[in-house]
Every structure is written in C-alpha cells, then in structure tokens.
Regions:
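Alpha-helical residues within the helix-turn-helix
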Residues: 38, 55-56
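Long, low-complexity, charged/polar intrinsically disordered regions in eukaryotic proteins
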Residues: 1-3
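A short, conserved structural fragment
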Residues: 58-65
Length: 97
C-alpha cells in the first residue's frame, strides 16, 4: 500500500493560511524573508519558520543572489510544479463558492 508521505507533506504545507500568503508574495515577486515579513506584517522569524516548511515540502526553493551593493542574499521562488498545483487547487475550491 502506498504511504502517501510526499502528498501528505505537500498538503499539510498548503493547509496553513500564512504559508498560502507567503506563496502569493513569492509568486508576486516579493521573495526574501525581510520583504515578505513587511508585506504580511509578521515577524521575520515567523516567515522563516513557514518558509522552512515550504522548503521541506519542495514547494519553494532557495535562490542565492546579490544585492546592488554586492551582498549575498537568499531569495525564494515557487517551483513550477507547486505553482501549477496551487492554481489547480484554487480553481477547484472556487467551484465550491
């Protein structure tokens, strides 16, 4: 019998309102924890905790980049497969309204 570990991890990660808001930010180009925390008016530590869950579920991935001043920073982006999944889920949920 199939264990459904990956499916469970992904659905659990997507079942949190804050993580869905973070995904929306990332998909809209707000992609580092500091920017996301300001956008959502949440503590950076809270955002980073939720990003770790999204990373573990392979919904987002880290992308190193440089600031204009040449400092290394970490950006996040939604994996294409995850973005497609979220879109399909949202379309199906809209049918319940």
């Amino acid at each position: 019998m199939k264990e459904y570990e990956k499916e469970s991890r992904i659905l659990k990660a997507l079942s949190d309102k804050t993580r869905l808001q973070i995904l929306e930010c990332v998909q809209n180009g707000i992609s580092n924890p500091g920017e996301i925390s300001r956008e959502l008016s949440r503590h950076r530590a809270t955002i980073e905790k939720h990003l770790r869950v999204l990373l573990a579920a392979e919904i987002v991935e880290k992308v190193p980049s440089l600031t204009r001043k040449g400092q290394l920073t970490i950006q996040y982006r939604t994996r294409k497969e995850a973005a497609d999944l979220v879109r399909v889920i949202q379309e199906h949920i809209a049918g319940f309204e």
